[in-house]
Amino acid sequence: MIKAIIFDLDDTLYDYKALERAAFDCVGELVRERLGVSEEQYGDAFKRARLATKEKLGETATSHSRMLYFQKTLEYLDIRPLYLALEMYETYWGFFLDNMNLYPGARELLEALHEKYIRVGVCTDLLAHIQHRKLRRLGMMDDVDCLVTSEEAGVEKPAPGIFNLCLEKLRLSAEEVCFVGDNLERDVKGAIAAGLQAVWFHPVDETSQEEKAEDGIDAVSNYQELYELLAGEIEGGL
Protein backbone atom coordinates (compact mmCIF):
# COMPACT_ATOMS: atom_id res chain seq x y z
CA MET A 1 0.00 0.00 0.00
CA ILE A 2 0.98 3.62 -0.45
CA LYS A 3 3.08 5.11 2.36
CA ALA A 4 3.97 8.46 0.78
CA ILE A 5 2.69 10.89 -1.83
CA ILE A 6 5.15 13.08 -3.72
CA PHE A 7 3.73 16.17 -5.37
CA ASP A 8 5.15 18.29 -8.13
CA LEU A 9 4.86 21.94 -7.08
CA ASP A 10 4.18 24.30 -9.99
CA ASP A 11 0.78 23.80 -11.64
CA THR A 12 0.10 20.82 -9.37
CA LEU A 13 -0.38 22.39 -5.95
CA TYR A 14 -1.35 25.83 -7.29
CA ASP A 15 -2.00 27.61 -10.60
CA TYR A 16 1.50 28.52 -11.76
CA LYS A 17 0.69 29.53 -15.34
CA ALA A 18 -1.84 32.20 -14.37
CA LEU A 19 0.54 33.75 -11.84
CA GLU A 20 3.47 33.64 -14.25
CA ARG A 21 1.52 35.62 -16.87
CA ALA A 22 0.30 38.17 -14.34
CA ALA A 23 3.76 38.61 -12.78
CA PHE A 24 5.30 39.02 -16.24
CA ASP A 25 2.78 41.79 -17.00
CA CYS A 26 3.53 43.44 -13.66
CA VAL A 27 7.21 43.65 -14.58
CA GLY A 28 6.20 44.98 -18.00
CA GLU A 29 4.48 47.93 -16.35
CA LEU A 30 7.64 48.69 -14.38
CA VAL A 31 9.80 48.54 -17.51
CA ARG A 32 7.47 50.81 -19.48
CA GLU A 33 7.30 53.37 -16.66
CA ARG A 34 11.03 53.44 -15.93
CA LEU A 35 12.51 52.89 -19.37
CA GLY A 36 9.85 53.98 -21.84
CA VAL A 37 10.02 50.58 -23.52
CA SER A 38 6.93 49.37 -25.36
CA GLU A 39 5.08 46.21 -24.38
CA GLU A 40 6.15 44.59 -27.64
CA GLN A 41 9.82 45.49 -27.17
CA TYR A 42 9.81 44.14 -23.62
CA GLY A 43 8.01 40.95 -24.63
CA ASP A 44 10.34 40.25 -27.55
CA ALA A 45 13.47 40.91 -25.48
CA PHE A 46 12.24 38.68 -22.67
CA LYS A 47 11.48 35.81 -25.06
CA ARG A 48 14.96 36.10 -26.56
CA ALA A 49 16.50 36.23 -23.09
CA ARG A 50 14.64 33.17 -21.85
CA LEU A 51 15.46 31.16 -24.96
CA ALA A 52 19.14 32.14 -24.86
CA THR A 53 19.41 31.20 -21.19
CA LYS A 54 17.83 27.79 -21.74
CA GLU A 55 19.97 27.09 -24.81
CA LYS A 56 23.12 28.03 -22.91
CA LEU A 57 22.37 26.15 -19.69
CA GLY A 58 20.34 23.21 -20.98
CA GLU A 59 18.33 20.99 -18.63
CA THR A 60 19.52 22.56 -15.38
CA ALA A 61 17.85 24.30 -12.46
CA THR A 62 19.70 27.53 -13.27
CA SER A 63 18.07 27.63 -16.70
CA HIS A 64 14.87 28.73 -14.91
CA SER A 65 16.52 31.74 -13.20
CA ARG A 66 14.36 34.86 -13.51
CA MET A 67 17.38 36.91 -12.49
CA LEU A 68 19.20 35.75 -15.61
CA TYR A 69 16.09 36.25 -17.76
CA PHE A 70 15.71 39.87 -16.64
CA GLN A 71 19.42 40.63 -16.86
CA LYS A 72 19.50 39.38 -20.44
CA THR A 73 16.24 41.18 -21.25
CA LEU A 74 17.91 44.49 -20.42
CA GLU A 75 21.00 43.52 -22.38
CA TYR A 76 18.88 42.84 -25.45
CA LEU A 77 17.28 46.26 -24.94
CA ASP A 78 20.79 47.81 -24.87
CA ILE A 79 20.34 48.89 -21.25
CA ARG A 80 22.95 48.37 -18.53
CA PRO A 81 21.81 45.22 -16.70
CA LEU A 82 22.49 46.53 -13.19
CA TYR A 83 20.13 49.44 -13.74
CA LEU A 84 16.85 47.59 -13.26
CA ALA A 85 17.31 43.79 -13.32
CA LEU A 86 17.12 43.32 -9.56
CA GLU A 87 14.00 45.46 -9.30
CA MET A 88 12.41 43.46 -12.12
CA TYR A 89 13.26 40.23 -10.29
CA GLU A 90 11.87 41.48 -6.98
CA THR A 91 8.73 42.86 -8.65
CA TYR A 92 8.10 39.54 -10.40
CA TRP A 93 8.47 37.35 -7.34
CA GLY A 94 6.84 39.88 -5.02
CA PHE A 95 3.64 39.84 -7.07
CA PHE A 96 3.86 36.08 -7.62
CA LEU A 97 4.26 35.14 -3.96
CA ASP A 98 1.66 37.63 -2.73
CA ASN A 99 -1.00 36.05 -4.93
CA MET A 100 -0.35 32.32 -4.43
CA ASN A 101 -3.08 29.99 -3.19
CA LEU A 102 -3.38 26.22 -3.08
CA TYR A 103 -5.79 24.65 -5.53
CA PRO A 104 -9.25 24.05 -3.99
CA GLY A 105 -9.24 20.82 -2.05
CA ALA A 106 -5.46 20.57 -1.71
CA ARG A 107 -5.43 21.61 1.95
CA GLU A 108 -8.11 19.06 2.83
CA LEU A 109 -6.14 16.29 1.12
CA LEU A 110 -2.91 17.24 2.88
CA GLU A 111 -4.67 17.15 6.25
CA ALA A 112 -6.22 13.77 5.47
CA LEU A 113 -2.81 12.36 4.51
CA HIS A 114 -1.34 13.68 7.76
CA GLU A 115 -4.08 12.02 9.81
CA LYS A 116 -3.29 8.69 8.14
CA TYR A 117 0.48 9.12 8.70
CA ILE A 118 1.08 9.21 4.96
CA ARG A 119 4.30 11.09 4.32
CA VAL A 120 4.33 14.00 1.86
CA GLY A 121 7.13 14.97 -0.47
CA VAL A 122 7.61 17.71 -3.04
CA CYS A 123 9.79 17.10 -6.09
CA THR A 124 10.25 20.08 -8.37
CA ASP A 125 12.41 21.51 -11.12
CA LEU A 126 13.82 24.96 -10.30
CA LEU A 127 16.05 26.60 -7.72
CA ALA A 128 15.75 25.62 -4.06
CA HIS A 129 15.51 29.15 -2.65
CA ILE A 130 12.42 30.23 -4.56
CA GLN A 131 10.70 26.87 -4.11
CA HIS A 132 11.19 27.18 -0.35
CA ARG A 133 9.60 30.63 -0.50
CA LYS A 134 6.64 29.29 -2.48
CA LEU A 135 6.00 26.44 -0.06
CA ARG A 136 6.16 28.80 2.92
CA ARG A 137 3.73 31.17 1.20
CA LEU A 138 1.35 28.25 0.60
CA GLY A 139 1.47 27.45 4.32
CA MET A 140 3.03 24.02 3.82
CA MET A 141 5.86 24.18 6.37
CA ASP A 142 4.21 21.50 8.52
CA ASP A 143 3.05 19.38 5.57
CA VAL A 144 6.23 18.55 3.71
CA ASP A 145 8.43 15.72 4.99
CA CYS A 146 10.77 15.71 1.99
CA LEU A 147 11.75 18.35 -0.58
CA VAL A 148 13.90 17.71 -3.63
CA THR A 149 14.65 20.37 -6.24
CA SER A 150 16.47 19.85 -9.51
CA GLU A 151 19.15 22.20 -8.16
CA GLU A 152 19.88 19.72 -5.37
CA ALA A 153 19.51 16.60 -7.52
CA GLY A 154 21.70 17.92 -10.33
CA VAL A 155 19.18 16.71 -12.91
CA GLU A 156 15.67 17.66 -13.94
CA LYS A 157 12.62 15.49 -14.37
CA PRO A 158 12.15 13.03 -16.03
CA ALA A 159 15.67 11.85 -15.14
CA PRO A 160 15.40 8.98 -12.64
CA GLY A 161 17.98 10.53 -10.32
CA ILE A 162 15.61 13.19 -9.02
CA PHE A 163 12.93 10.62 -8.17
CA ASN A 164 15.50 8.29 -6.59
CA LEU A 165 16.71 11.10 -4.32
CA CYS A 166 13.14 11.52 -3.07
CA LEU A 167 12.96 7.82 -2.28
CA GLU A 168 16.28 7.99 -0.44
CA LYS A 169 15.04 10.85 1.73
CA LEU A 170 11.73 9.13 2.44
CA ARG A 171 13.50 5.79 3.05
CA LEU A 172 10.84 4.00 1.06
CA SER A 173 10.82 1.75 -1.98
CA ALA A 174 9.40 2.99 -5.27
CA GLU A 175 6.42 0.65 -4.94
CA GLU A 176 5.37 2.39 -1.71
CA VAL A 177 5.22 5.87 -3.24
CA CYS A 178 2.82 7.64 -5.60
CA PHE A 179 3.83 10.73 -7.58
CA VAL A 180 1.28 13.40 -8.52
CA GLY A 181 2.15 15.91 -11.24
CA ASP A 182 0.70 17.99 -14.06
CA ASN A 183 3.28 17.23 -16.74
CA LEU A 184 2.57 13.92 -18.44
CA GLU A 185 6.09 13.42 -19.79
CA ARG A 186 8.27 14.86 -17.03
CA ASP A 187 6.22 14.07 -13.94
CA VAL A 188 4.08 11.06 -14.69
CA LYS A 189 6.11 9.05 -17.19
CA GLY A 190 9.31 10.00 -15.41
CA ALA A 191 7.97 8.69 -12.11
CA ILE A 192 6.65 5.50 -13.69
CA ALA A 193 10.02 4.88 -15.36
CA ALA A 194 11.63 5.19 -11.92
CA GLY A 195 9.26 2.54 -10.57
CA LEU A 196 6.80 4.78 -8.71
CA GLN A 197 3.06 4.78 -9.06
CA ALA A 198 1.82 8.01 -10.63
CA VAL A 199 -1.28 10.15 -11.13
CA TRP A 200 -1.62 12.81 -13.80
CA PHE A 201 -3.14 15.96 -12.29
CA HIS A 202 -4.70 17.55 -15.33
CA PRO A 203 -7.23 20.36 -14.86
CA VAL A 204 -9.18 20.58 -18.10
CA ASP A 205 -9.10 23.98 -19.80
CA GLU A 206 -8.99 25.39 -23.28
CA THR A 207 -5.26 24.77 -23.64
CA SER A 208 -5.27 21.10 -22.69
CA GLN A 209 -8.34 19.52 -24.25
CA GLU A 210 -6.31 17.56 -26.81
CA GLU A 211 -3.95 15.93 -24.31
CA LYS A 212 -4.98 12.46 -23.21
CA ALA A 213 -3.50 10.10 -20.68
CA GLU A 214 -2.33 6.81 -22.11
CA ASP A 215 -3.90 3.50 -21.11
CA GLY A 216 -2.94 2.51 -17.60
CA ILE A 217 -2.23 6.06 -16.41
CA ASP A 218 -4.63 7.44 -13.81
CA ALA A 219 -5.73 11.03 -14.49
CA VAL A 220 -7.69 13.48 -12.34
CA SER A 221 -8.87 17.01 -13.03
CA ASN A 222 -9.27 18.32 -9.46
CA TYR A 223 -8.39 17.53 -5.86
CA GLN A 224 -11.71 15.92 -5.05
CA GLU A 225 -11.03 13.33 -7.75
CA LEU A 226 -7.47 12.92 -6.49
CA TYR A 227 -8.74 12.43 -2.92
CA GLU A 228 -11.12 9.69 -4.04
CA LEU A 229 -8.47 7.97 -6.14
CA LEU A 230 -5.83 7.98 -3.40
CA ALA A 231 -8.34 6.79 -0.80
CA GLY A 232 -8.50 3.49 -2.62
CA GLU A 233 -4.71 3.09 -2.56
CA ILE A 234 -4.17 3.83 1.13
CA GLU A 235 -4.77 1.23 3.82
CA GLY A 236 -8.00 2.08 5.63
CA GLY A 237 -8.87 4.79 3.09
CA LEU A 238 -8.80 8.50 3.81
Regions found by a protein language model. Name each.
Residues 26, 30, 34, 109-118:
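A short, Lys/Arg-enriched amphipathic alpha-helix followed by its capping loop at the start of a domain
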